[in-house]
Amino acid sequence: MSYFKTILSNGLTVISYPMPSVRSVSLGLWFRVGSRDENSQQAGLTHFMEHMMFKGTSTKGPLDISMHFDKLGAEFNAFTSKEYTCYYARFVDDKLEDALSMLAEMVIDSTFTQEAIDTEREVVIEEIARSEDTPDDYVFELYNSSTFPQHPLGLPVLGTRERVGTYTHDDCVNFHQEFYHAGNLVVAAAGNLDHDNLVKLVNDYFSHLKSGVQTARKLSVPAFSAGVHSCLLYTSPSPRDYAAS
């Protein structure tokens, strides 16, 4: 069975893969923005924005969002990579509209209140601390920074404590305007669904998302650094060795 693809008039792309033998649907909103698109003043902002999408809209608080998905019996979450940001949900097939409408409201109508920013700032800083204290994660970051020095690809997706500590309401609004538009979004779904119905629902719930073409990526060629790189990190109570090569 092949997949179906439709590009809406506002530039948004809808892709579906019908699977009539199942009774569930996996739905994802894929934004073409990752940590590689950040400049030196935005380190970690892509990931921070992912967190902020769950912190409330003009009509719903974070608990309302969570309870909405809980009532659907849905799994929902998000993740940020170097290449893209994804918001997703998995649910039984007759809850497609309910899940899609809430995901749309989250990414279109988030309010970015200063109170939510201050709260989530501490959450992300703690996430950075956990990553630094996890050998697997830390080695991966050492590898990236050694392989792509002085380049966005070499920086951690989570950002740094220093940069995360500076983000404001205006930073979030400006980032949202630059990257969260129809031309930068792919709505993809697989499961027991009809493509034409999915397109109709996306048209209905994303009509308020501003039109646009794909945001041009600020691409630069990284200076690849080959060879063996080693680092010894001392932590209490005993030292641990990390190496990337």
Regions found by a protein language model. Give the residues of each.
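Short loop-to-beta-strand entry elements in the cores of soluble alpha/beta enzymes
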Residues: 183-189
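Single conserved hydrophobic/aromatic residue that forms the stacking wall/gate
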Residues: 234-245
